[in-house]
């Protein structure tokens, strides 16, 4: 093997010539013949490599300097150029290090613990300039073809899916990335602790004490004996189909109905994935029913049934290894569970749990549209339905927890599901279904999706700093609201039959929601000193319209089975506007004041959580209501409403005393409205800030003053 180290060379010169360096090396002493001036007798010093001419001719070179014999004879320019240094071979030990590093990156990536900037490995580098090098992450592009090249979905025969968007993992080959069979997973997840060691202690014990956190660290347990009887299961399934499924459309009812009928007869034969669906259906069915219905159908109080099935849902998720699942039934069950829990648990805990659902969906590739990934038509529709339920749920969680963080619109390209009925799609279909015109089973969900997609579709611009969306001016807001209203009216509401409970609910909620958007856009006028009486009354009329629609939906007997949805949906802007104007003594006439308080009473009658719950938002609304009552109660001598009595009882220890405030001066009456002004200090009439996706279900997503409420003392 030739040495590639270049040595110093000597340039020979005649006695009358100058020394001319041919290489960047110190010159040696000239030969005696050179000193004596004998050019013809010049001695040469050989190079350690051939000249370029001899290399090309593939002839022997005597490597003389400055000109070899061959070049001198042929009168060619003799050029010596050293070979580039050869890349040193990696030792086997170094290869092992890179292989282990790639393996560890795969593990971290599978558990979403590897940041995008560190998602590459030095094992495939081309240079030796550094010990470890990383590639810059590929930017997310909206082009569906780009997504197809950047990542792919791997489907197994049992319907599992795994989305891969990492060059290393793709290079590893698809075969290594498939999920383990369920039988192997059981052995892999087997708890090796003894029975005495299985009970978590310390911090783990504190986590396990919380029913939800226990699902993260719990052990597998059989649920066969906890299934209801076949007759009870049939009743729960019918309740779910009637009360829940029309408003969620996460499941394909014909397919699940067959599975449900088979499994409810033989619970021991159910798979772990399907068992998650079974128990969440039981739980959600009970959640959607009243206490009287539960007692009549099952002879148990609603609270007792909810507690029982909530425990079994959590255990079923543990049994299915839900934190690393790639199975659609498990994520469908978990999403349904979160929808029911959204108003039942702490908002910060709910935000974390919703984040888990989003990560699982991204791991399964739901954030990429199935058509661009080449999936079957049935899979495409079901994945779209599930992802578009997670979007508003994630936005709701981010808003109610105060983080304001939700899925960035630039991180997904999943299209809305088609306007079709369940009988138009089925597993194994090869041709995409034809979308129908008019009202379908998807009418409620699609109407909500149009509103959720409102800001993304209508050409809004992003702020220079942050991810919130900002319109240019009030005229743009009004124009865009009109456009989305016309779109929804044309596509859906014009086909609604108000005798159909689902259509009646859809019409009421959507029109109420659009009015609430208009109200939100105009609410900052209340803070302006130049607002006219006519402008204020137009705002009041709009707010009253929203409250009246809400009360109408609640009072309609045909929509009683959808009340669970209405508990999570209320447009608080309208209530705030009414209370703000009630607090202005003299704005309402006595008859108008009585009518306004009647509308507020209806709100509290329909939303008893305003009195019972202790969430920050509800406590703030209660304080605002009491301020308005103490500043400007009705003029008649009717008895004090029950909701005011309950609020005074709860908040009197906090410093609100009705007796001390029974007679208010004009200054104190003005102070009664001062609390409202705090909600408008940072608002103006031209900006409308919404965090990412618009969420029809989120009360705080409608409530632009919610974050200011969180900064207001509740004492």
From Swiss-Prot:
Biased amino acid composition, Polar residues: 119-136
Biotech use, per record: Viridicatumtoxin and its derivative, viridicatumtoxin B, exhibit anti-methicillin-resistant Staphylococcus aureus (anti-MRSA) activity. Moreover, viridicatumtoxin and a C2 acetyl analog, spirohexaline, have been demonstrated to inhibit bacterial undecaprenyl diphosphate synthase, a potential new target for antibiotic development.
Location of the DNA-binding region in this protein: 51-78
SMART domains documented for this protein: Fungal_trans (SM00906), GAL4 (SM00066)
Major localization listed first in the record, in broad terms: nucleus
Keywords: DNA-binding, Metal-binding, Nucleus, Transcription, Transcription regulation, Zinc
Key word Cytoplasm present: no
Assigned GO CC terms: nucleus
GO terms of molecular function: DNA binding; DNA-binding transcription factor activity, RNA polymerase II-specific; zinc ion binding
Keyword set includes Aminoacyl-tRNA synthetase: no
Name of the protein described by the UniProt record: Transcription factor vrtR1
Naturally occurring in which organism (per UniProt): Penicillium aethiopicum
């Amino acid at each position: 093997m030739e040495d590639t180290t270049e040595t110093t060379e000597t340039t020979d010169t005649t006695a009358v010539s100058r020394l001319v360096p041919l290489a960047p090396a110190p010159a040696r002493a000239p030969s005696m013949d050179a000193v004596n001036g004998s050019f013809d007798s010049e001695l040469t010093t050989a190079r350690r490599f051939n000249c370029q001419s001899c290399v090309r001719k593939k002839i022997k070179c005597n490597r003389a300097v400055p000109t070899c014999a061959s070049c001198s004879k042929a009168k060619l320019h003799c050029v010596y150029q050293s070979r580039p240094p050869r890349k040193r071979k990696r030792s086997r030990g170094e290869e092992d290090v890179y292989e282990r590093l790639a393996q560890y990156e795969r593990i971290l990536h599978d558990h979403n613990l590897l940041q995008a900037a560190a998602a590459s490995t030095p094992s495939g580098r081309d240079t030796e300039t550094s010990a470890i090098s990383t590639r810059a992450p590929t930017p997310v592009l909206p082009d569906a073809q780009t997504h197809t090249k950047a990542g792919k979905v791997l489907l197994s025969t049992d319907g599992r899916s795994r989305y891969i968007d990492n060059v290393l993992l793709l290079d590893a080959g698809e075969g290594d990335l498939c999920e383990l069979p369920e039988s192997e997973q059981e052995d892999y997840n087997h708890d090796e602790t003894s029975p005495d060691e299985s009970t978590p202690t310390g911090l783990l014990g504190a986590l396990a004490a919380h029913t939800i956190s226990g699902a993260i660290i719990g052990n597998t347990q059989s649920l066969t004996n906890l299934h209801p009887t076949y007759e009870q299961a049939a009743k729960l399934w019918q309740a779910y189909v009637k009360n829940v499924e029309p408003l969620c459309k996460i499941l394909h009812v014909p397919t699940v109905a067959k599975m449900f009928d088979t499994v409810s007869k033989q619970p021991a034969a159910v798979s772990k994935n399907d068992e998650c669906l079974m128990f969440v259906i039981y739980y959600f069915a009970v959640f959607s029913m009243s206490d009287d219905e539960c007692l009549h159908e099952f002879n148990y109080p609603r609270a007792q049934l909810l507690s029982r099935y909530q425990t079994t849902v959590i255990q079923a998720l543990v049994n299915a290894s839900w934190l690393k699942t790639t199975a659609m039934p498990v994520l469908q069950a978990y999403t349904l569970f979160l929808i029911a829990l959204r108003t039942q648990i702490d908002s910060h805990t709910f935000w974390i749990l919703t984040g888990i659902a989003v990560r699982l969906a991204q791991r399964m590739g739901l954030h990429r549209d199935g058509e661009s990934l080449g999936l079957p038509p049935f899979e495409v529709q079901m994945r779209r339905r599930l992802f578009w339920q997670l979007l508003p749920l994630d936005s709701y969680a981010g808003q109610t927890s105060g983080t304001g963080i939700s899925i960035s619109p630039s991180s997904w390209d999943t299209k809305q599901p088609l306007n079709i009925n369940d009988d138009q799609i089925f597993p194994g279909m090869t041709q995409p279904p034809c979308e129908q015109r008019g009202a379908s089973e998807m009418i409620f969900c699609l109407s909500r999706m149009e509103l959720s997609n409102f800001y993304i579709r209508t050409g809004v611009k992003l702020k220079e700093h942050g991810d919130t969306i900002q319109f240019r001016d009030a005229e743009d807001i009004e124009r865009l609201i009109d456009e989305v209203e016309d779109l929804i009216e044309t596509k859906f509401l014009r086909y609604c039959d108000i005798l159909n409970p689902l259509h009646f609910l859809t019409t009421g909620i959507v029109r109420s929601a659009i009015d609430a958007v208009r109200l939100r856009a105009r609410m900052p006028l209340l803070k302006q000193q130049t607002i006219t009486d006519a402008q204020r009354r137009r705002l009041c009329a709009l707010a009253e319209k929203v409250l009246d629609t809400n009360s109408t939906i609640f009072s309609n007997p045909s929509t009683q089975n959808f009340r669970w949805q209405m508990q999570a949906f209320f447009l608080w802007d309208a209530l705030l506007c009414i209370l703000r104007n009630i607090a202005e003594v003299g704005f309402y006439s006595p008859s108008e004041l009585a009518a306004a308080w009647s509308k507020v009473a209806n709100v509290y009658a329909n939303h008893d959580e305003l009195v019972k719950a202790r969430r920050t938002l509800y406590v703030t609304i209660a304080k605002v209501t009491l301020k308005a009552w103490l500043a400007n109660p009705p003029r008649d001598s009717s008895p004090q409403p029950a909701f005011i009595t309950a609020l005074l009882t709860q908040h009197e220890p906090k410093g609100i005393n009705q007796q001390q405030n029974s007679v208010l001066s004009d200054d104190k009456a003005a102070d009664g409205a001062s609390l409202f002004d705090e909600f408008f200090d940072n608002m103006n009439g031209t900006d409308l800030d919404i965090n990412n996706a618009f969420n029809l279900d989120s009360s705080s997503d409608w409530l632009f003053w919610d974050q200011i409420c969180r900064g207001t003392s509740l004492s």
